[in-house]
């Protein structure tokens, strides 16, 4: 008993210390609830795709596609991480990185170019200032960007940056080049090779929708030009500072959170392109940031840059290209489907594709603005078009300073980075003249027709500086300020300004350029619109002939808007410049000094700036999509010099001054991207769709005799416009279509101008819901000349639209219209019978 009694007091505390007090049931539940909800969410996310596959009746191939997409995402993320580590190692210790071995394209600019200086003193200064730069950037995000995003939309009212850390790695200048030749004596031009590899963390959150996203690393590389002008005799000796990129910089972003979806193949290039386009709107030539250093400097004059000249590129032909298409696993050599990518600064042009030809003839013309010719080159790359990845056929790079000296070059150039191949170019440097003395001669040289206002080569350049507007009306609502934007058009070319929100006194300070075919017959049309209510706030029409009689062919004033308020005005500065080719007399044995610039890095490294920017979709809509330097269509072209024969040994042959009647065709497009060729998928699915339609037709027949047009008919108007140099197709309506489901059909019309079945050549109408007799009344056009269109066939297909992953998609009928008719210029309207495969071409005579 005593022992028991002795154990009691000793054991009691021991049990009390070893056993915790019982917890309340509510507290245990509150601790496990988040984990339970997370487990349920993960289980739901895993089971939902399985349920969706069964519910929609999809095949197992969708599972394989998802796994392949996941593997691709992980591989892409791993490659991004390796590139980031390599760039960080190069920034931390250049000498050690070079010893260990680094690719030539990753080396700094001062290694390749002797006139580029290494500026370590500048990098040390930036490194010392970097913590304070980071503080400024954090304040910019939290005090400027965050309130602006919150006020932009009611759904973003809870938007906030949870973390803004730019990282410890400072911005680095890999090389500095100062220009001393071909520059104005009152300016200093510097090119900075900048590189930023930041292990930054920028996280954002929208609490209202439990949405988190962010960025964990950013890489940006590019050439930034700094211009100090004008130099003055008083302190601080420089009037203003202008900063811009010569071309779009290279950009790579690693996303976190919800924005990880942007790393999915197909979306990663699109997201980077959108961000690059935003940067281009502010910082890529001709856009620039101008900082005045003294009050006396006319900042508006610095923001109204006049191009140094216009480069007219005759992209004529190539010879002896490599055959990249092979058969039987390379045993049989084939030909190539060559096309060219031409680049001048930030302007990118793409030629048409010549099928199966090693000596293609393009005969196309491009016109490009040149703002800063010191440091700018004409870059050309040739590729063989393939369904998967286009093969490289050669490149060429020509310094624009040499072209300016020569004024006219008509030569065969040997392609670089390939064993064989030559390219025939004719380059013209057009000077901008501020008077109309040579206008008649220029119009005669380009054969400008009096009845032809806007087609053909350009005779002049219109430069417009949109400053501001005052006293704009309120639009539809009296008590609300409008969201004004300005639409400007000359002929068929139109451009838009940025939107200024909630103001009747907008300030734009934007530059625009238009190539003009005949300034005596064309007008500048300007309209101010309210983006919020889609209504007009005022308009203005200025005949370009008015500029011909103005002082220095320039007008700088406030214009009274019509159909607007009594005091509504728009301030603009407009200048017209005549494009004049100054031909120089040369002796017969004259040898020009133009040299082809050889690449200093490998083909993969040098092509990165071009190929990285060729992923933008040209079909993106919205403001600022109209190019400021469009390729001009050529209908009546001047006769050009006979094409010289390619040289046997020298890359630069002698000029043949013989004459012939050969002419150049129009360039089909001015785009910023090389489009894929989706016709492969269309060709694969076509037999399946035709087979399904035939089976559906047999079910409809079911022992009965169908009429003459069992699939129905479609009404089209087809004509060719010689003034616009386009084929016009109007889709009016369809009748007596077959029902694709119990609710009828959801038809739309798709068209190709064969043999072109690329995405850029496709035209589609809107979808008419639940009807067998849809009415479209939509007009479409194809840029093609009359002789060319008479050798083509119009492929028209009526299809049934369905929802995403729907089984109700399919073909309702096709028709092939052979356009070999002499009545095409007049046009016709006709009903066409739909067939299951369109194998009965319908010829109009």
Curated annotation (Swiss-Prot):
In-chain residues carrying the UniProt-annotated modification Phosphothreonine: 629
Question: Where is the protein found, in the record's own terms?
Answer: Cell membrane; Endoplasmic reticulum membrane
Task: State the UniProt keywords alphabetically.
Answer: Calcium, Cell membrane, Endocytosis, Endoplasmic reticulum, Lipid transport, Lipid-binding, Membrane, Metal-binding, Phosphoprotein, Repeat, Transmembrane, Transmembrane helix, Transport
Ranges for the region named Required for phosphatidylinositol 4,5-bisphosphate-dependent location at the cell membrane are 757-764
Residues given in the record as Ca(2+) 1 binding sites? 324-325, 384, 386, 391
Q: InterPro entries this protein is in?
A: C2_dom, C2_domain_sf, C2C_KIAA1228, Ext_Synaptotagmin_C2A, Ext_Synaptotagmin_C2B, Extended_Synaptotagmin, SMP_LBD, Synaptotagmin_SMP
- Which cysteine residues pair off into disulfide bonds? none
Write down the superkingdom of origin: Eukaryota
- Annotated GO CC locations: cytoplasmic side of plasma membrane; cytosol; endoplasmic reticulum membrane; endoplasmic reticulum-plasma membrane contact site; organelle membrane contact site
Q: Kindly report every residue range on the membrane side named Lumenal.
A: 49-51
Polar residues bias located where? 612-628
Report biased composition (Gly residues) as residue ranges: 1-17
Annotated GO molecular function terms are:
calcium ion binding; phosphatidylcholine binding; phosphatidylethanolamine binding; phosphatidylinositol binding
Annotated positions binding Ca(2+) 3:
386, 388, 390
Where are the annotated segments for Disordered? Answer: 1-26, 584-664
Pfam families membership:
C2 (PF00168), SMP_LBD (PF17047)
Ranges for the SMP-LTD domain? 115-294
User: What does this protein's UniProt record list under function?
Assistant: Tethers the endoplasmic reticulum to the cell membrane and promotes the formation of appositions between the endoplasmic reticulum and the cell membrane. Binds glycerophospholipids in a barrel-like domain and may play a role in cellular lipid transport. Plays a role in FGF signaling via its role in the rapid internalization of FGFR1 that has been activated by FGF1 binding; this occurs most likely via the AP-2 complex. Promotes the localization of SACM1L at endoplasmic reticulum-plasma membrane contact sites (EPCS).
* Quaternary structure, from the entry: Homodimer. Interacts with ESYT1 and ESYT3. Interacts with FGFR1 that has been activated by FGF1 binding. Interacts with the AP-2 complex; identified in a complex with the AP-2 complex and FGFR1.
What PANTHER family does the annotation carry? EXTENDED SYNAPTOTAGMIN-2, EXTENDED SYNAPTOTAGMIN-LIKE PROTEIN 2, ISOFORM C
Domain comment (free text): Anchored to the endoplasmic reticulum membrane by a transmembrane hairpin structure; both N-terminus and C-terminus are cytoplasmic.
Report the protein name in the record.
Answer: Extended synaptotagmin-2
Which species does the entry assign this protein to? Mus musculus (Mouse)
Q: What is the lineage of its organism?
A: Eukaryota, Metazoa, Chordata, Craniata, Vertebrata
Q: Which gene encodes it?
A: Esyt2
């Amino acid at each position: 008993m005593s022992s028991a009694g002795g154990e009691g007091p000793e054991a009691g505390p021991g049990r009390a210390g070893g056993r915790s007090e019982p917890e309340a049931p509510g507290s245990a539940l509150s601790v496990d609830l988040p984990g339970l909800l997370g487990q349920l969410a993960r289980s739901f996310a895993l089971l939902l795709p399985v349920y969706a596959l069964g519910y929609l009746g999809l095949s197992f191939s969708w599972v394989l596609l998802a796994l392949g997409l996941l593997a691709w995402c992980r591989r892409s993320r791993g490659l991004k991480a390796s590139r980031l580590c390599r760039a960080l190692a190069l920034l931390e210790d250049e000498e050690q990185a070079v010893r260990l071995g680094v690719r030539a394209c990753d080396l700094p600019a001062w290694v390749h170019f002797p006139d580029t200086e290494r500026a370590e003193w500048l990098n040390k200064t930036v490194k010392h200032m970097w913590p304070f730069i980071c503080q400024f950037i954090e304040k910019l995000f939290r005090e400027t960007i965050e309130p602006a995003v919150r006020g932009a939309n009611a759904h973003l009212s809870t938007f906030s940056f949870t973390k803004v850390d730019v990282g410890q790695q400072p911005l680095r200048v890999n090389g500095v080049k100062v220009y001393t030749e071909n520059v104005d004596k009152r300016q200093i031009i510097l090119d900075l090779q900048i590189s930023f590899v930041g292990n930054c963390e920028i996280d954002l959150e929208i609490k209202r929708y439990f949405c988190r996203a962010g960025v964990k690393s950013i890489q940006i590389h590019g050439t930034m030009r700094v211009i100090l002008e004008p130099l003055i005799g008083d302190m601080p000796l420089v009037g203003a500072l202008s900063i811009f990129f010569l071309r779009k910089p290279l950009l790579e972003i690693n996303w976190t959170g919800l924005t990880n979806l942007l790393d999915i193949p197909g979306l990663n290039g699109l997201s980077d392109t959108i961000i690059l386009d935003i940067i281009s709107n502010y910082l890529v030539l001709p856009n620039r940031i101008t900082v005045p250093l003294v009050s006396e400097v006319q900042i508006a004059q610095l923001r109204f840059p006049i191009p140094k000249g216009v480069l007219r590129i005759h992209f004529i032909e190539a010879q002896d290209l490599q055959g990249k298409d092979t058969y039987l696993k390379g045993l049989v050599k084939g030909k190539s489907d060559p096309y060219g990518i031409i680049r001048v600064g930030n302007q990118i042009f793409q030629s048409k594709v010549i099928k199966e030809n090693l000596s293609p003839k393009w005969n196309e013309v491009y016109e490009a603005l040149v703002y800063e010719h010191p440091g700018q080159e004409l870059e050309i790359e040739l590729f063989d078009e393939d369904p998967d990845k286009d093969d490289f056929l050669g490149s060429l790079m020509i310094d624009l300073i040499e072209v300016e000296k020569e004024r006219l070059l008509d030569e065969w150039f040997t392609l670089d980075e390939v064993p064989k191949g030559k390219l025939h170019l004719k380059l013209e440097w057009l000077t901008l003249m501020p008077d109309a003395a040579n206008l008649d001669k220029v119009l005669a040289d380009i054969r400008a027709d009096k009845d032809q206002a806007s087609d053909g080569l350009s005779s002049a350049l219109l430069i417009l500086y949109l400053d501001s507007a005052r006293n704009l009306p309120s639009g539809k609502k009296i008590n609300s300020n409008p969201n004004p934007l300005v639409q400007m058009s000359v002929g068929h070319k139109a451009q838009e300004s940025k939107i200024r929100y909630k103001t009747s006194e907008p300030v734009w300070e934007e530059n625009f350029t238009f190539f003009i075919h005949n300034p005596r017959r064309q007008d500048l049309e300007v309209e101010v619109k309210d983006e919020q209510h889609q209504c007009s706030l005022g308009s203005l029409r200025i005949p370009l002939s008015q500029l011909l009689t103005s002082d220095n062919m320039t007008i700088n004033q406030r214009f009274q808007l019509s159909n607007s308020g009594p005091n509504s005005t728009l301030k603009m500065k407009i200048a017209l410049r005549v494009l004049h080719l100054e031909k120089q007399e040369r002796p017969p044995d004259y040898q020009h000094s133009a040299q082809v610039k050889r690449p200093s890095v490998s083909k993969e490294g040098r092509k990165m700036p071009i190929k990285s920017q060729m992923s933008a979709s040209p079909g993106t809509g919205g403001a600022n999509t109209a190019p400021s330097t469009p390729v001009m269509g050529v209908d009546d072209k001047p006769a050009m010099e006979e094409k010289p024969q390619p040289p046997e040994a020298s890359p630069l042959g002698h000029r043949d001054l013989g004459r012939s009647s050969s002419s150049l065709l129009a360039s089909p497009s001015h785009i910023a991207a090389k489009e894929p060729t989706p016709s492969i998928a269309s060709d694969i699915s076509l037999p399946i769709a035709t087979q399904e339609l035939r089976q559906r037709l047999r079910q409809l027949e079911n022992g009965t005799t169908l009429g003459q047009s069992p699939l129905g008919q479609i009404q089209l108007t087809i004509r060719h416009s010689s003034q616009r140099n386009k084929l016009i197709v109007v889709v009016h309506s369809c009748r007596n279509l077959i029902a694709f489901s119990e609710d009828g059909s959801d038809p739309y019309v798709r068209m190709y101008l064969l043999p072109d079945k690329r995405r850029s050549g496709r035209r589609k109408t809107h979808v008419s819901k639940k009807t067998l007799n849809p009415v479209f009344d939509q007009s479409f056009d194809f840029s093609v000349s009359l002789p060319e269109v008479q050798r083509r066939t119009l492929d028209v297909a009526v299809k049934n639209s369905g929802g995403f992953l729907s089984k109700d998609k399919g073909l309702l009928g096709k028709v092939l219209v052979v356009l070999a008719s002499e009545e095409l210029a007049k046009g016709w309207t006709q009903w066409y019978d739909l067939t299951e495969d369109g194998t009965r071409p319908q010829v109009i005579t």
